[in-house]
Amino acid sequence: RTTMKKIILTLVAALGFAAGSALAAGGGIPLDKAPVKTNDLASLQNGAKVFVNYCLNCHSAAFMRFNRLKDIGLTDQQVKDNLLFTTDKVGETMKAAIDPKQAKAWFGANPPDLTVIARSRAGAGGSGADYLYTYLRTYYRDDTKPTGWNNLVFPNVGMPHVLWELQGDRRPVFEEHESHGHKTQVFKGWEQVKPGLMTPLQYDQTVGDLVNYMQWMAEPAQNTRKRVGVWVLIFLGVFTLIAWRLNAAFWKDVK
C-alpha cells in the first residue's frame, strides 16, 4: 500500500510539473530532436554519470536501483567507485542528496522524481526526450528571476541552470516582427556571453547522453522488449505461412 501510494504521488507530481511546462512552452520554440539511442552503452554510461553528478543532488529516481546499471554495462564495483554518493549499497534506489524539507524551503516545492520523466513529458510538440533535450539547452541569464536564470521552453522556471558551468552564459537573440499592428518577438539564435567548460558541440553531446540515459531509465526493459518483439513478429510470420499452407493441404481434396 505504501509503495503504491508513493508511486501515485510521484506520478501526480511529475504530471503536474509536466502540465506547467507544457503551458509555459505554448508560445515557446519548437523542440529539437533528441539523439536517443538506448542501445548505445557508451552514451548511456556517460549519461548515468552526468545524472548522478548533477541531477541526483536535488532530484530522486526512486524507482531505479543502482544495480540495474549492470544492464548498460557497468559492474557493481564500477558503480560503487564512481556513482554511489547517496548510499553505500548498489541495491538501493537512487535517492536525492538534498533533504526534502530543505528542498521545499529553497524551491517552494519538492523537486519531482525523474524516474519516468522522459515519458511523462511527451506531447504534441515531440517526445519527452525531445522536451528534455531542448529544455536543458535553452537556459539563459535573467537577473530579474530569483534563481538568476530563465528558460525559453519553460518561461519563469523555478529550477536553476545546474549545467551552467559546462555550457557557460548565453543570451537569446530576438527579432521584432509587426503584423496587423501587433509586435511579436521571434527567437533567432544565441549569443555566447561567457564560455563554459565545454564547446557548444560538446555540451549538446553531453545533454544528449543525459537525455538518452533518462529515456532508458524510464523503461530499462525497452531494449529487451524491442529485441524480443522482432523475434515474435518473425515467429508469427513463419507460423502464419505454415498455417496457411497446412490449411490449403487439408482442404485440397474437399475442394
Q: What label would you give each PLM region?
A:
Residues 10-19:
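Bacterial N-terminal signal peptides
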Residues 71-195, 204-208, 212-215:
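Extracytoplasmic electron-transfer domains, predominantly the class I c-type cytochrome c fold
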Residues 25-49, 60-71, 79, 218-226:
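Electrostatic cytochrome c docking/interface patches
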Residues 200-224, 228:
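Juxtamembrane amphipathic/hinge helix adjacent to a transmembrane helix
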Residues 51-62, 210:
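The canonical Cys-X-X-Cys-His
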Residues 1-3, 189:
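Short, Lys/Arg-enriched N-terminal segments with co-localized hydrophobic residues
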Residues 225-230, 234-255:
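Juxtamembrane interface at the cytosolic side of transmembrane helices
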Residues 3, 18-24:
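Sec/Tat signal peptide C-region and signal peptidase I cleavage site
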